[in-house]
């Protein structure tokens, strides 16, 4: 079993800042542990999966569920207690596939983008300056509107952004600079570009 506190301590001993990563709403273990936090399957008693069960489909936490937002916040708190002052959140989003079979419960007409904004606001208010929260999104989710977010990532009010560049879309230094500038103009305070094909992560 990995001890997060020991991992954080080792990084600090080496003069490095320990940073943890969470999968946020793409958490099948959490979804199965408490079904009230998960996206349901319309008209059925079981959970919605992001693929066929035979193809290893996974359930997701429901961004509209207060319990799911609280649960993710509690995970962040556990990491902070273990010594991680920065946490990268991936999958602060809705599943890429959309279907009438997805049951999000009562949404009160709140859009996907507004719900994600509200979820982020809960975490930011809870942790304030105690934990630096980063939000990690694909280049496509940053550059344009997607079904997963409802708006480009910066319009969610993200202050600390990690942009994941797919290998097929590796960027030149000029393109990366333009991307960072565009996000700054959209209100993002800190941008990290992860372009593995170019060996770039800063």
Model-identified regions with their sequence ranges:
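Active-site groove signature of glycoside hydrolases
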Residues: 60-101
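Active-site-adjacent "subsite" loops/lids of carbohydrate-active enzymes
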Residues: 25-77
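Substrate-binding cleft of secreted/luminal carbohydrate-active enzymes
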Residues: 153, 157-202
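Substrate-binding cleft of carbohydrate-active enzyme catalytic domains
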Residues: 6-25, 76
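Glycine-rich tight-turn/loop motif centered on a GG-T
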Residues: 100-114
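Aromatic-lined carbohydrate-recognition surfaces of secreted/lumenal glycan-active proteins
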Residues: 19-27, 88-91, 110-149, 164-167, ...
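Aromatic-lined carbohydrate-binding/catalytic grooves of carbohydrate-active enzymes
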Residues: 1-2
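Short, acidic/polar
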Residues: 66-80, 143-155, 175-176
